[in-house]
């Protein structure tokens, strides 16, 4: 199910693979997980930021947005990751602030923020006799909740050959390579399979059913399409199936329905079918 992945270009921050023996439904959900589900750290301008500013042109809200936009090149953690910016401009000229003016700490201990070159906190000039002091604590989140947590990009293109794709991942965070992101996306997909299986296990108890409707959270429509495709194409189960389709999303419902119909003389019940399909995806 995972296909054959061969690296065409392999850089620290971007990798391109030639992917064979899989299907667009699979590479598409891997792409979606990378764009939506991979967690990272970001500063929060709400209850995690304390700003003491004197004689500044910018408002505190504007300052908070500039700090919030700083990329954090440190793995997501539940420990306290903090930035402190405390500067007084005693010169006669305006001073533009960078990450070199900041101190980064993890649980109170100074850490390297891993910026190759100082990252400009722009536009945030500090004029003569102006002072700024900011203390901000990072929070962990996912891109699907807020774009500031996005830690990379990913996409794919189909080749002329059937089910052959050029798939690429670009990392925006220095603590992880594209290959790390691919591995993490696959682990998240495994978790999605198991969480969904647990949510529908009660629906699968009746071994005599010849048709069944299984709900999937409507935010997981790509997952639903992947399951539908595998049910129809998996050689271990497709001979047992007459029909399988995803019903259109009803805006009044919170789920997508996967409708499955199996053959009357089938020796495999729905519980076995779904289990085989999910194991094939992983």
Give the residues covered by each predicted segment.
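Protein-protein interaction/assembly regions in multi-subunit complexes
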Residues: 1-282
């Amino acid at each position: 199910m995972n296909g054959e992945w061969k690296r065409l270009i392999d850089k620290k921050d971007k990798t391109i693979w030639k992917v064979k023996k899989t299907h667009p439904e699979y590479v598409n959900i891997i792409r979606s997980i990378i764009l939506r589900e991979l967690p990272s750290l970001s500063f929060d301008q709400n209850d995690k930021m304390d700003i003491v500013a004197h004689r500044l042109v910018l408002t505190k809200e504007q300052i908070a947005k500039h700090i919030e936009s700083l990329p954090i090149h440190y793995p997501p953690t539940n420990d306290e990751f903090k930035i402190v910016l405390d500067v007084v401009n005693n010169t006669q000229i305006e001073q533009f602030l960078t990450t070199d003016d900041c101190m980064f700490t993890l649980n109170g201990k100074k850490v390297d923020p891993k910026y190759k070159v100082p990252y400009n906190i722009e536009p945030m000039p500090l004029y003569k006799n102006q002072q700024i002091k900011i203390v901000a604590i990072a929070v962990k989140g996912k891109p699907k909740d807020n774009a500031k947590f996005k830690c990379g990009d990913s996409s794919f293109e189909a080749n002329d050959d059937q089910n052959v794709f050029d798939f690429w991942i670009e990392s925006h965070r220095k603590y992880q390579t594209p290959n790390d992101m691919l591995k993490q996306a696959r682990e998240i997909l495994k978790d999605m399979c198991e969480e969904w299986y647990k949510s529908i296990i009660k629906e699968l108890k009746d071994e005599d059913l010849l048709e069944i409707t299984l709900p999937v959270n409507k935010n997981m429509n790509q997952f639903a399409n992947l399951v539908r495709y595998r049910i129809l194409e998996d050689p271990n189960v497709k001979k047992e199936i007459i029909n399988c389709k995803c019903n259109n999303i009803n805006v009044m419902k919170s789920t997508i329905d996967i409708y499955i119909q199996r053959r009357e003389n089938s020796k495999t019940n729905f519980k076995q079918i779904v289990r085989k399909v999910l194991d094939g995806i992983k």
